[in-house]
Amino acid sequence: MNKKLEHRFVTELESNQNIVHKICSLYTNDRDSHNDLFQEITIQLWKAYPKFRGESKFSTWMYRVALNTAITLYRKSKRSIKTQDYDSVIFKIKSNEYDNTQEEQLKLMYKAVKQLGDIDKALIFLYLENKNYKEIAETLGITEVNTRVRMNRIKGKLKTILNP
């Protein structure tokens, strides 16, 4: 990867890393797992970046790669992240420590969301990020109608979980 492309990747990732941290919070239960998943998502983004065509916003593309990575790793019963000798640039990215205390109000919601299925988690996450149904559908690769139907079902499930 040339230096200009490398610099653009690092800049984009640093400015959008909170998206990755939020996804990590949805799919992990402890700080070490969170950091491991963050690193794996960063590696997958780095590997896929040369194929990014710019047909969508970087953040939309990043959501898709990050969610697919998180879901894939979440589904594996035994996580075995293979470490390879990647270009050192991906480890130069300054990762702000994610401060869970700033989101105390969302703890109950996250706990409820963690009880949902993989795709439903991704869908509600994008909804909570103020993405519209069209953007959610494009990111997850499902139809807009399916997105609306699933969202209504998810809202019902969350109401049941939060108000037993």
Can you say where each PLM-predicted feature lies in the sequence?
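A short, charge-rich alpha-helical start-of-domain segment used by transcription regulators
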Residues: 1-22, 35
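Residue-level preference for hydrophobic side chains embedded in well-ordered alpha helices
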Residues: 12, 16, 20, 41, ...
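Structural recognition of an alpha-helix C-terminal capping motif at a helix-to-coil junction
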Residues: 36-43, 47, 56-68
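Hydrophobic positions on the alpha-helical face of helix-turn-helix-like DNA-binding modules
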Residues: 41, 65, 123-124, 136-137, ...
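Arg/Lys-rich amphipathic alpha helix in sigma70-family domain 2
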Residues: 51, 64-84, 102, 153
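Internal acidic/polar
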Residues: 80-109, 132-133
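Short amphipathic alpha helix immediately N-terminal
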Residues: 115-135, 139
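DNA-recognition helix of helix-turn-helix
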Residues: 140-164
